[in-house]
Amino acid sequence: MPGLVPGIHVLLARQRERRGLPGQAHGRLAQSVLEEVHGIDSTRFQLVTNHLDSKRINTVQHQNIVFHSLLKQIPWTIFDRLVEQHDADWDDRVVKTKAHLIAMLYAQFGGARSLREIETSLKSHASKLYHLGGCTVSRSALSTANARRPAEVFAGLLSALMARLQAGYRRKIGDCVRLIDSTSVQLSGLSGHWATFSAGVCGAKAHIIYDPDADQPLYLMVTPSNVNDITAAKEMPIEAGATYVFDLGYYDYGWWASLDQAGCRIVTRLKVNTPFKVVEVRSVASGSSILSDRTGYLPKRLAASRKNPMSNLVREIRVVIETGKMLRIFTNDLTASAQEIADLYKRRWAIELFFRWVKQTLKIAHFLGTSENAVRIQITIALIAFLLLRLAHDATKIVTSPLAFARLIRTNLMHRRSITELLQPPPKPKPQQPMFKFEPHATRAVQRRRASRATCEVAA
């Protein structure tokens, strides 16, 4: 073969036998051997490879994305047990529960407002979803999963995360303060088959028990908006010995009596027209916001001559707030100071701030489904996202504001960065030695020497 040095024919024969090529492929094989032995490419430049670079091991460490750091906080063992318990992966045609959770959490952290936006965004990050344990999902599959998958799976995961956060705030039972309230969210008219509130208005309610010291919810119940607050409260678990603070939406003497029998301290409001039989008038400091401090009894009889179950000695404290309005604060605590009781009721605003933060930061204003199950899943996963942000924020403390931290997470969600370095500029890439360098076409004598060495190596 013209132009080939002695010894190349041996290589060609062995390569042809190894690859099983016919004889007419001899020309193409000769060109490939030239590239392998001589380093001559189609541009007729000599390709010289550094021996050390060819065997160099890539020591660059893999950097997970920010979303992965958030998902690490999830107790996946408990989650898998919940999936099996509720048979959540019963249908292979529906997206798996883990991929469903990851997609919905991406919508919460990333601010996606529709199923189509979730589908498109996940497709653009398909290569990164593998390390998360997720996958791309179509909007039809996600819609079906929201409508059919049991919401109890995600409710159980929410309870596990709540318990994990609560474990870091060990206190005496008497020091536990629990705030109870609800918030309403508006739904589209397509949810009218289960969430009709009035003519043309549909909505749902999220009933929450909130711990102001730990700054986290402890209990969640989602109902249609026409369900009364006290109806949901009667199904809430009661923690014996804790202090419960709530507003006039939970005005029920029977429920108050059940809290009193459990040893709980009650701090709430009395209606303006509620009679109060005074037994003792206590002194108050002049010039303070406390107008009066009295002990006595509630009415013995209710409507339709029903007996009042709240028959023990109780206390009424009249307070003037900043707006000049007078409040009648009710409590069954006869020993604490009037100012302490007033301050406890003032702490009720912490749950209102929590509702505002969740509505402004997470996605419960635009719902991805119209069924009751889909709404329950989205609200539950929104609170799961809140707890994951809390766990990550407590572990890093790169910023003091939870809102600023949530914005940083949203901006860098799919970036390969550490959560602790979100405020720092990304490091500059280190200059690397080129794997190849180009030299002019080597001389015929150099080719002959290299071919001879290659022939000896193959023969050996």
Q: Where are the language model's segments positioned?
A:
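A cross-taxon signal for low-complexity, glycine/charged-rich
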Residues: G7, A13, G23-V37
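Major-groove recognition helix of helix-turn-helix-like DNA-binding domains
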Residues: L132-R148
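Cationic, low-complexity basic patches in intrinsically disordered or flexible, solvent-exposed regions
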Residues: R16, S32, L47
